Amino acid sequence: MFVILHNKLIIYYLDMSNNKEILNRIQNLRKNLNQYNYEYYGLENPSVSDYEYDMCLKELIQLETQYPEFDSPNSPSKKVGGYISEKFNKVKHEIPMMSLSNAFDEEDLLKFDNDIKKAIGSSDFSYVVEPKIDGLSISVKYKDGNLIQAVTRGDGEIGEDVTQNIKTIKSLPLNIEYDKDLEIRGEVFLTKKDFEKINSDPNLTKKFANARNAASGSLRNLDSNITAKRNLSALFYYVPKATELKIAKQYDVLSWLDKQLIPISREIRHCNNIQGVIERISELTDTRDQFKYDIDGIVIKVNDFNHYEEIGYTSKFPKWAIAYKFPAVVKQTKLNSIDVTVGRTGRINYIANLDEILLEGSQVKKATLHNYDYIKDHEIMLNDIVEIYKAGEIIPKIIRSIKEKRDGSQVVFPEPTNCPSCDSKLVKKEQEVDLYCLNENCVEKQIQQIEYFSSRDAMNIEGLSISIISQLFRNKIINDAIDLYELAHKKEILIATKQKFYRKNDDGTKTEFERSLFKDKSFTNIIEAIEKSKSNSMEKFLTGLGIKYVGLRAAKALSKRFKSIEELAMATREEIEQVPDTGEKMSESLVNWFSDPKNQDLLWRAKKVGINFNYINEFNDVVVKNEHQKYMNKTFVITGSFNKSRNEIKNYIESVFNAKVSDSVSKKTDYLVVGENAGDSKLKKANDLKIEIITEPFWDN
């Protein structure tokens, strides 16, 4: 199986006859997608483009479908990406805010259309086509005609309450004529004009990379006065409980919203069939640059709500809608220089410095170059004109150099021989293309390791940025991650520590100034975040240790099996290899890591400062009743709506009964859990197969 990017760049070849290679590829895709989700939603600073993310997700879904034995309920293909900040009150969505599956070409659209026809057994249906706005998803609630709450999508299950900030949007009415409970969903964004105005503000300490980041930062600002000045816009496109309005079609819902003076897009069209959809997509693709705001695709929905339950849902996507994604834009610019950096594992990275260029709404001047072999194989030289495409909101990727535009000024970039941080000799490991710094005392490596320990997937110490960690380490206030837990006793030192900053002047020069690394409030916030991390479950600490091959997913599996760091440290390779998501390389890496006296000392110190070493099961206190023992190790399917979200019910069933939850009814299904407005097709199939139906909310007992 080949994967080709932009029909130019072959990424890898996968031997489809080798199950181990397939599993490794699936695990790598899951790991990468989890990281990309964190970067996009949590950091708002993605390292890959939407297109590249979508390609990874599409490949993962294909492999999981083709090899169901490697499927997992915890795969990122089953989850809605998102992130919940600690700054705002958390609110649980009554109905989860799901994402959409993607289409990338006409073939994908025709397959989507064919799947709909099969699901409803007819071609008598139509579509609604809507621009996909590149903004921040929002849920707004009205009660008695008054706007009472606004919540971001968050992770799809829980979002952030931004009610005060949403009220600053001038086009959104605070009162409507409809006097019953109403929830509407849409997108908050900035027009291109308003984005340019914000970024041209001389008082802005750091420019936003693009309009989406600016909209997100503005809506989630703690000061509503600042939000009001940003002139946010919003358009709405969905009513989760539209049937309560006695409306049966999506296009009619949009007309109803318009009558309530709730803003909707004027580019929405009703199409009688898939050919009409394809024609409309072609029109929007040609005119997308003329929009007053950024759009990153087109949403296609089945118009008639009566078909929705019949068509069904996955745990992540509704099957009655799809998002067509625009192909990535390729542009040319000049490569001026290449920076060499080192990461936490010692791997050497290459960042290209470019002539600044506008690419898909962002000003970009840097690009990633993978590794030195990539530079050499693609014959990329300094001063080349290169083709780049969007590989992130800040960092794009270089596809190739344009040799016919060379003017004689080009220079070969030499392969580095020494670490850019510590000057140690670089080494290329067996069967790897990357160069590594093996010096354990390398300053930059150690800083990156502490940053990884603090990251969301690991100990999740909010507010502890890489710049703060760097200052703490370089000022010898900390020597490793465990030293973070001693900072509470060093308040005077921390507040006295100065950090250098540089401000760019109008004439291109820079002015240096200093300010304290911490003030009283920021010190208190950091210490509270550090203290809070002590009570994390075992898998978070295990992930943060940065043991080779052990990411969060593997750490979870190991934690469930061994229950404590102490038990894992005493486990043999054979015992470790019996755990799902592990293997020979991981077991060897773990045993070697726990055998190292230096690491044993680190664990002793971690225990001493109070870091939790035990696995915490949130369902540990649940006692399974006798009448529910039959659910143990069985396969369930869920249909309809309940007093809890499907993901909550799914998590409960999997954790309490060690059971599997599937998306579709088959001969392997043991139980069908049925809620309100359940789909007729699943019920019919379950009855035909004589599968037991459950209607009681046993998770409440």
UniProtKB/Swiss-Prot annotation:
InterPro entries: BRCT_dom, BRCT_dom_sf, DisA/LigA_HHH, DNA_ligase, DNA_ligase_AS, DNAligase_adenylation, DNAligase_N, NA-bd_OB-fold. GO terms for molecular function: DNA ligase (NAD+) activity; metal ion binding. It catalyses: NAD(+) + (deoxyribonucleotide)n-3'-hydroxyl + 5'-phospho-(deoxyribonucleotide)m = (deoxyribonucleotide)n+m + AMP + beta-nicotinamide D-nucleotide. It comes from the Bacteria. CDD domains: BRCT_DNA_ligase_like, LIGANc. It holds the Pfam family BRCT. Keywords: DNA damage, DNA repair, DNA replication, Ligase, Magnesium, Manganese, Metal-binding, NAD, Zinc. NAD(+) binds at residues 50-54, 99-100, 130, 153, 187, 301, 325. Its EC number is 6.5.1.2. Residues 626-701 form the BRCT domain. Its cofactor is Mg(2+); Mn(2+). Zn(2+) binds at residues 419, 422, 437, 442. One of its GO terms (biological process) is DNA repair. One of its GO terms (cellular component) is cytosol. The active site is at residue 132. HAMAP family: DNA_ligase_A (MF_01588). Belongs to the NAD-dependent DNA ligase family. LigA subfamily. DNA ligase that catalyzes the formation of phosphodiester linkages between 5'-phosphoryl and 3'-hydroxyl groups in double-stranded DNA using NAD as a coenzyme and as the energy source for the reaction. It is essential for DNA replication and repair of damaged DNA. NCBIfam families: dnlj, PRK07956.1. This is DNA ligase.
